Amino acid sequence: MRFFHSIIVLLFSISTGSAFLLYGCNLSENLCDNDESCYPDGVFGQCYSSESGSPEPTVLDNLDDTQLELLKLELTRLAAKDKDWGDEETQCVLAYFKMSMFYQLQYDPDFCQVRKPANVWALIQLIDTGLTEDPTILDEDVNPENVTDEDMAQIIEQLKEPSLPTEEDIEEALNAQNEDVDDEILDQYVQAVVNNENPDFSELSDGQLNILIGRLVDLKKNVENEEAQLLTGDGEQEMAVPLDDLEERGEQAILKKDIEQVGEINQGLDNTEHKIVKGRKDQVVTRVDANRVYLKVHLKNEDQLMPLIEFLQNTIAIPNNLYFDDFQFENGQLSMRISRFEGAKPKADKRIDSVEGVASAVYKRRKDIARLSGADVRETGIGSGEDGSLPVESSERDWLLMPVLFVCAFTVTALGLVAAVQIARSRRHYKDNIQQIAEQLDGKNSFAYQDLCRQRADGGRASKSSSTSSWCEETAVPTIDISTGHVVLNFLQEYLSEPTKIEAQWNGIKDYRNEERTKTKAEKFASQNRTILPFDDNIVDIDGKTAENEDFYLNASFIYDDDPRQAVYIAAQTPASSQIAAFWQTIWQHGVCLVVNLSTPEECKQEKNYWPDTGSEVHGAFEIHLVSEHIWSDDYLVRSFYLKNLQNSQTRTITQFHYLSWQKESTPTSAKSILEFRRKVNKSYRGRSSAVLVHSWDGSGRTGVYCAVDVLCARLLRGIRQIDVVATVEHLRDQRDGMVATGDQFKLVYGCVAQEVNHLLKSIATK
């Protein structure tokens, strides 16, 4: 009792106006608000603002293999439901997992499997925030129930996907289909017997007759037991019925899962009377017939009762294996007894398994009842409609809906208007003072602020779930000045307006190749190469075995910009079927988080895809699981994978950006789509020390164009004062042959860089 009292105190001590912090911002860039940052919480990051006044989020350290496996299974189940990071159920699961692991609570896989997971998520966040603000709220003598290894293994088993059906399961399913047909026939005979009719039993087989007799005997016993309980009830205490006894009598406990969690819950279908007793024994005792449902109806004449009863039998009772009998009608109130036969299977997809559900179902069908029988249902509930009844649905409550909606709409509109006025005032004030602020700053504090941001990024805290932990986004305000930008733009536009200049440059470098470098390692595996062979001194080495074993060879080269110690790209050919394991080994070994795929779907079909279309696949020592696939435009899509090392059970997240419409040795119809694609890549999760793996069918032409455009645009952001496309292409070809393969691709580099300079100048003018 002291623990629950502490929880109540905790909930009332938390500010109701605090915003809920979203989880998963390391993997989804759009989760956090503008004033929030992604706080490294040891899982997938949590949105947090230091100005909100909320305490810093808790941090999970050193999750063991079992906890990581549990988290993976939860995420797999969410991915199977097409839940994204912003979904309420996803946020509920992440919040509950984090709180359970941090406070060592018993974990329940179905905790968030409710109709409105947002409510559970809100409760978890309130409790977690309160415990963080004041850990002394909980009583010292309340010991949390630690999760044992057996409990965790049992939870993981609940989350695992079901295995494929065996032959016995298939045969049992086929027999069950035949039994459904018999059940429908036998239900009609049982209904006829209950209604005192004389059905013709000659059409039934011997087996069906035996089943029918058994059902009637069981039904008779149930009715007798119910009557005996009513007669022997002492009005003071209800005897508990053990669950084992229910199973021996062929009865079934409803929602057994809930019974195991919170004790025995009577769903109202057993023929029992619940006595609500308050005060002394000599006070009034109110009884509720928990196996009866009543309807308050308005009838023009009692002839309308029969169509009403027939409608209830056909639409509610029969589809759910329920029996409605003992109908009583008095003073505009119709009541009936609800019972259920446990031996048959329900015919409805969503089974009604409580008297409350029956009452709600009747009220929902009140319009159909009025149309077919003329009866007007005004209220439904549990009981016989007398003083001890419990209303479930009533038309008297419906009139409140429109006023409540009106008040809500008015409130939202008023808040929106207030916010709009405040924003307009803030912008007007900002415009009036922007010039004065700019003169005071004179550009000095801007550089100091940028330097501070770089220092904080370099000293950032590492993530627990990956070896890389930074966000690489292009600088919001580029360091290039407007005058330099216009000079560069005029230079590029001059070349684009005179194609002969670009053609002359291309003729000078189209046959350029570095003859001083050797390719002996790649020549050993000639069958694994398409057209381009990587150089020996910058070939991507896998576990130091590239030159020894064909299984550890991948046609890929490290590409450097101005820092020879750190590769910016890994340029590779699209892996053949025999190179898929080496491809994923390369990604794992060199900490790659981003993969840029420039091969068309037609080219990918020539070899087996290195990623699964659905579910997961195992290649070598790695298991690859497809988490999501989003189509961002007609030209490209984005896939997200979980990569698991089967040797040490570590996992990482890999994002693939697939450009679909760029044919080999050609150019896209628009440079704009290439630039949008590049910006999307550069705004995604990338480690400070990890290269971007860029591949096309042969790993040369299209790969070279993408690397050249990205290198030149990145230099512009760093504030260089001149652009040399020819020197950039030669620099790339010094590291891998064939980078930028045709004159049209060379011209595309000019066009992309010119559009990017124009975009930067517009952004500078806007800001």
Curated annotation (Swiss-Prot):
It holds the Pfam family Y_phosphatase. Its main location: membrane. Residues 527-756 form the Tyrosine-protein phosphatase domain. It comes from the Eukaryota. Disruption phenotype: Viable and fertile with a reduced brood size. Locomotion is slightly slower and the expulsion step of the defecation cycle is often missing. In males, impaired mating turning behavior characterized by abnormal repetitive turning during the first turn. 50 percent reduction in dense-core vesicles in ventral cord neurons. Paralysis induced by acetylcholinesterase inhibitor aldicarb is reduced in 50 percent of mutants. Resistant to aldicarb-induced reduction in brood size. In a unc-64 (e246) mutant background increases dauer formation whereas in a unc-31 (e169) abolishes dauer formation. SMART domains: PTPc, PTPc_motif. It is found in: Cytoplasmic vesicle membrane; Perikaryon; Cell projection, Axon; Cell projection, Dendrite. The keyword Protease does not apply. In hermaphrodites specifically expressed in neurons and in particular in the head nerve ring (ADE, ALA, ASI, ASK, AUA, ASG, AVH and AVJ neurons), in the ventral nerve cord, pre-anal ganglia (PVP neuron), in the tail (PHA, PHB and PHC neurons) and in vulval motor neurons VC and HSN and the vulval uv1 cells. In males, also expressed in neurons anterior to the nerve ring and male-specific neurons in the tail. Keywords: Cell projection, Cleavage on pair of basic residues, Cytoplasmic vesicle, Glycoprotein, Membrane, Signal, Transmembrane, Transmembrane helix, Transport. GO terms for biological process: exocytosis; positive regulation of anterior/posterior axon guidance; positive regulation of neurotransmitter secretion; regulation of secretion; ventral cord development. Residues 1-19 form the signal peptide. It is a single-pass type I membrane protein. Residues 420-767 are cytoplasmic. One of its GO terms (cellular component) is dense core granule. GO terms for molecular function: transmembrane receptor protein tyrosine phosphatase activity. Proteolytically cleaved probably at a dibasic consensus sequence by egl-3. The chain crosses the membrane at residues 399-419. Regulates dense-core vesicle (DCV) trafficking and/or secretion. Probably by controlling DCV trafficking, plays a role in the AVG neuron-mediated formation of the right axon tract of the ventral nerve cord. Involved in locomotion by regulating acetylcholine release. Probably by controlling the secretion of FLP neuropeptides, regulates the turning step of male mating behavior. Plays a role in preventing dauer formation. Belongs to the protein-tyrosine phosphatase family. Receptor class 8 subfamily. This is Receptor-type tyrosine-protein phosphatase-like ida-1. It comes from Caenorhabditis elegans.
